[in-house]
Amino acid sequence: MKLTSTVLGARDPRALAVFYATLLGWSIKTDEPERVTLHPDDGGPGLSFQLEPDHVPPEWPHANGVQQMQMHLDIEVDDLDAAGAAAIDAGAGLAAFQPQEKVRVYLDPAGHPFCLWTRE
C-alpha cells in the first residue's frame, strides 16, 4: 500500500488548491470542476480538494454541538514568524486559540485548521 493523497472537502476546491499551492510551493497536477490535486515536485504524497457543496467549516478549538475537526495538517517550517506571514498573505486566518509555543494554528480559506510548527 502507498498513501498518495490527503483529501479536504471545500465549496470551492480550486480556490483551496490555489491557497495550498501558494503556501507549499507545490504544483497543481489535476484540475477538474469537482477535484483538484497538488503534489510536491519530489513525487511524494500530495493533497486533493474535492467539491462538497454543503461543507461546514469545523470549529477550533473543539466545542460541543458544532462541526468537529476530523483532521488537520501539520507543516514543519524553519521560521515560524515568516511562514505565518506567508500563510496570512496566501489567505489563511490566525486561529484565536493557540495551544503551544512552537506551534501556530491557522484556518485555511475553507475553515480547515492547519498547524505550522518548528522544532526550535
Language-model features, listed with the residues they occupy:
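Residues at or immediately preceding the N-termini of alpha-helices
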Residues: P13, L80-D81
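Vicinal oxygen chelate
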Residues: M1-T4, W26-H72, G84-P109, R119-E120
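Amphipathic alpha-helical segments
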Residues: D12-S27, A87-D89
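N-terminal amphipathic alpha-helix initiation
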Residues: K2, L8-D12
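Short hydrophobic/aromatic beta-strand micro-patches
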Residues: V7-G9, D74-E76
